[in-house]
């Protein structure tokens, strides 16, 4: 069912880790394959991160393990966030109710939904997926890009002018633990999440897209005084454990989707660091 499983890690495991091992532990590649749903399982907060390329209707699979859950709906005890990251309109049908999802629109699907199907409307549709365990059911809700809460941050002079769009936060869409949004860097800006921060009570996944074929993002992670980096290409994701900073710089401006899960739903629950603390 899952293309790869990522285990939770301790900061001590960063000591002397090779570049290949670092990528193997945190980088999620190959999420978008024609006609497939690709899902990865992360033990950090039990995150599921994945991608869909709907060349024809594709159903979210049922659970396959453990044996006691085999055949049960994927969202029996989970909630799901979806954003259309392609250039064509798609459609998501949840228990018989269809939602048209244009590029940059999203959908929150509540725990307990039984049948979720993805398809294209005017060509193959590309959807990015994140799912977390849920303890309560809420309302399945379309998340229009036009309705997302924009937060303007940074400045062109510091190469980090960006707009943060909040899709799933308590003021716009109720969820059990999932927070979801998208950050768009302005032309001439390349730094995200600057200055960086920590949130010890939450894990976070970053999904980078909108990059050219020859562009890359250098994603920085690790403890503030023991930083490492992972070079990331278009449509790749990275998991940030609670003890790790997370920020990036690109060879050009780009867009990334952030998804968080953990103990609370307070977007501002973070420990902002001074850039001089980094090593």
Curated annotation (Swiss-Prot):
UniProt cross-references to InterPro entries, sorted A to Z: KduI (IPR007045), KduI/IolB_isomerase (IPR021120), KduI_N (IPR027449), RmlC-like_jellyroll (IPR014710), RmlC_Cupin_sf (IPR011051)
GO molecular function: 4-deoxy-L-threo-5-hexosulose-uronate ketol-isomerase activity; zinc ion binding
Enzyme class: isomerase
Gene Ontology biological process terms in this record: D-galacturonate catabolic process; D-glucuronate catabolic process; pectin catabolic process
Gene3D superfamilies: Jelly Rolls, pectin degrading enzyme 5-keto 4- deoxyuronate isomerase, domain 1
Pathway participation: Glycan metabolism; pectin degradation; 2-dehydro-3-deoxy-D-gluconate from pectin: step 4/5
Cofactor note: Binds 1 zinc ion per subunit.
Keywords associated with the record: Isomerase, Metal-binding, Zinc
Domain of life: Bacteria
Enzyme Commission number: 5.3.1.17
Transmembrane intervals: none
Catalytic function, reaction form: 5-dehydro-4-deoxy-D-glucuronate = 3-deoxy-D-glycero-2,5-hexodiulosonate
UniProt cross-references to Pfam families, sorted A to Z: KduI
Cofactor needs: Zn(2+)
Positions bound to Zn(2+): 197, 199, 204, 246
Record flagged with keyword Isomerase: yes
Entry function: Catalyzes the isomerization of 5-dehydro-4-deoxy-D-glucuronate to 3-deoxy-D-glycero-2,5-hexodiulosonate.
Family, per entry: Belongs to the KduI family.
Protein name as it appears in the record: 4-deoxy-L-threo-5-hexosulose-uronate ketol-isomerase
């Amino acid at each position: 069912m899952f293309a790869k499983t990522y285990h939770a890690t301790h900061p001590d495991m960063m000591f002397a880790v090779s570049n290949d091992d670092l990528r193997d532990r945190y980088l999620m590649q190959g999420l978008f394959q024609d006609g497939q749903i690709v899902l990865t399982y992360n033990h950090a907060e039990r995150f599921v991160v994945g991608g869909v390329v709907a060349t024809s209707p594709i159903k979210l699979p049922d659970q396959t393990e453990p044996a006691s859950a085999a055949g049960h709906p994927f969202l029996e005890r989970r909630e799901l966030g979806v954003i259309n990251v392609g250039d064509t309109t798609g459609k998501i049908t949840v228990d018989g109710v269809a939602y048209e999802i244009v590029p940059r629109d999203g959908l929150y699907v509540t725990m307990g939904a039984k049948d979720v199907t993805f398809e294209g409307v005017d060509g193959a549709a590309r959807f990015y997926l994140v799912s977390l365990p849920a303890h309560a059911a809420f309302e399945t809700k379309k998340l229009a890009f036009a309705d997302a809460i924009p937060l303007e941050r940074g400045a062109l002079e510091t190469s980090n002018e960006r707009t943060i769009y909040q899709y799933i936060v308590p003021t716009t869409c109720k969820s059990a633990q999932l927070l979801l949004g998208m950050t768009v860097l302005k032309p001439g800006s390349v730094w995200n999440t600057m200055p960086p921060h920590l949130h010890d009570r939450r894990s976070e996944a970053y999904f980078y897209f909108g990059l050219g074929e020859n562009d890359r993002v250098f994603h920085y992670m690790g403890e503030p005084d023991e930083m490492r980096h992972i070079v990331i290409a278009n449509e790749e994701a990275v998991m940030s454990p609670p003890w790790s900073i997370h920020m990036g710089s690109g060879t050009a401006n780009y867009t990334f989707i952030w998804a968080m899960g953990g103990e609370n739903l307070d977007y501002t629950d973070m420990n902002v660091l001074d850039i001089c603390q980094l090593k």
